[in-house]
Amino acid sequence: MQTWDAIRARRNVRSYQTTPVPDADLNRIAEAAWRAPSASNRQHWDFVIVTDPDQLRALSAVWRGAGHIAGAAAAIALVVPTTDDDRTRLIDYYDLGQATYAMTLAAADLGIGTGHSSVGDQDRARKILGVPAGHDVAFLLGVGYPADRPLRPIAKPSRRPLDEVIHHGRW
């Protein structure tokens, strides 16, 4: 798939086929996160690829919106150092947003769906993943082949009209 087609085809997938995602594809998706830009090239992140069904089921309970993780072929946990500094947290989470989007596009390019989730229960998430103290599991990204329909460019996405959100020169 070409980049523009991947951008147009990407959507949040919350229901997955039972087909496993090949390790090479999971590694490529994670590499997209590794290649994402970060503030001052700090790379305050780590990524944990999870394919074990028991771990996926356990992770689905760390946030009320993470139920889809249980049915995913895999999940990628996005981990950052714990900080009390608001500016550092803001920058780190912005960087994770870029890494997440890079992964969603890399996955879409392969015909693989993704669905993101926050993490509420840090202690539980750290225990499931073996994440050391001093780090937070910020987000989860469910990964798998869509159960409903393949990824294809969406002609009319459910979005606010483009001319309402794009401004030139001034608001």
Predicted features by range, described:
Residues 25, 52, 126-127, 133, ...:
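Short Asp/Glu-rich motifs
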Residues 5-18, 139-171:
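C-terminal helix-cap and adjacent tail motif
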Residues 33, 76, 84-128, 141:
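Small-aliphatic-rich amphipathic alpha-helix that forms the alpha element of a beta-alpha
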Residues 24-31, 35-96:
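Glycine/small-residue-rich phosphate/adenosyl-binding loop
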Residues 42-45, 109, 138:
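Short secondary-structure junction motifs
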Residues 1-3:
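Charged, compositionally biased N-terminal leader segments and the immediate start
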